[in-house]
Amino acid sequence: MDSATRNPNYSPEVDPQPLPSTNPIHSRPIFSFPKRPALRITTEFDSESTVFFHKISCKFLDSLAKLKFAFHNNSKGEIAEPQISFVSKYLSLHYDLEDHSALVKSSVDVGPKLKLIGTHDVKAQQGEVTMVANLDDPGYALQLSTPLPSIALPKATFKFPQGEISLQEINDHDEDEQVKNSLSVSGTLKGQLLKGLCTAQYKDQEFKLRYRYKDDEMSFLPILSLPSNALSFAFKRRFGPSDKLSYWYNCDSNYWSAVYKHTYGEDFKFKAGYDSEVRLGWASLWVGDEGGKAKTAPMKMKVQFMLQVPQDDIKSSVLMFRVKKRWDI
């Protein structure tokens, strides 16, 4: 019989364990240096303009703000349009080193449903102040904006789920060079009609009617402008998950254009088309998402090759390319 069975008060001997140190000096290094923020370098090149565009940026303050430096340089190495930017959620500053001009943008949440947005050009001494008030019902908002220095009443825009309406005072000059104030009305109204979306837009005394029908294989978009009675329409047909044909025609000018697109996975795209207005045929190949960023492309690099063939002078065909590369350091 073992000792635990003979003596109910028996407890085995346990080696003593060292107690954890409560002195904070021994729990962290004597000298601690802040972690260097990650640098993001992006370079773009366009063979048509033979100009490089460079951008260097980094985030700091736990990604609450970003510092960016951007500039162009040509084939001779000359630097042009250098700009420094500081961007955060509530304040951004863009400074042009050549023009010595600064653009300041700021936004302040006055309340849970009220926001103030301000923009100021320091060199031009001009700016704009906008107030946005979100109403209790979702999708409804009232926006007031005025330029600084103010020369007219603020522009008022009322937004609702079916569109928006804007009222703005405009200062015109008559034949006697006297200032004449007038009220300008613009707006957009949209709604469902015959399994499609109908949109009516009025701006600058021009009225546009759009109707868009779209399903999994086809989309159709006619556009009518009044009072010019200009009519155009766009048609798109999908032949599978990788092939799509787009066609656009203007009934007044008889100009038309067509584009065929074929995708190879997510990173390769081939497009070919023709534009009758400029009498130009073209074809392009994209490596990387055409509308995406370089960080999602293979090797963080996007490349586009484009061949342009003029109909009237085939011998003057041009092959161009664009490259965009990103480095994370």
From Swiss-Prot:
Single biological process term from Gene Ontology: monoatomic cation transport
Statement: the UniProt record of this protein carries the keyword Plastid: yes
Any one GO molecular-function label of the UniProt entry: identical protein binding
Role: Voltage-dependent peptide-sensitive high conductance rectifying cation channel with a strong affinity for TIC32 that is imported into the chloroplast. Conductance is pH-dependent decreasing with decreasing pH values.
Biased composition (Polar residues): 1-10
Gene name linked to the record: OEP37
Stretches of the chain found on the membrane's Chloroplast intermembrane side: 71-87, 122-138, 164-205, 227, 254-255, 283-302
Family to which this protein belongs: Belongs to the plastid outer envelope porin OEP37 (TC 1.B.47) family.
Alphabetically ordered keywords of this record: Chloroplast, Ion transport, Membrane, Plastid, Plastid outer membrane, Porin, Transit peptide, Transmembrane, Transmembrane beta strand, Transport
Bilayer disposition of the protein: Multi-pass membrane protein
Main localization of the protein described in the UniProt heading: plastid
Transmembrane region(s): 61-70, 88-97, 114-121, 139-148, 155-163, 206-214, 217-226, 228-236, 244-253, 256-265, 273-282, 303-312
GO cellular component: chloroplast outer membrane; pore complex
Stretches in topological domain Cytoplasmic: 58-60, 98-113, 149-154, 215-216, 237-243, 266-272, 313-329
Name the UniProt record assigns to this protein: Outer envelope pore protein 37, chloroplastic
Species name: Pisum sativum (Garden pea)
Top-rank taxon: Eukaryota
Subcellular location as annotated: Plastid, Chloroplast outer membrane
Residue range covered by the transit peptide: 1-57
Subunit structure, as described in the record: Forms an hourglass-shaped multimeric complex.
Region feature (Disordered): 1-29
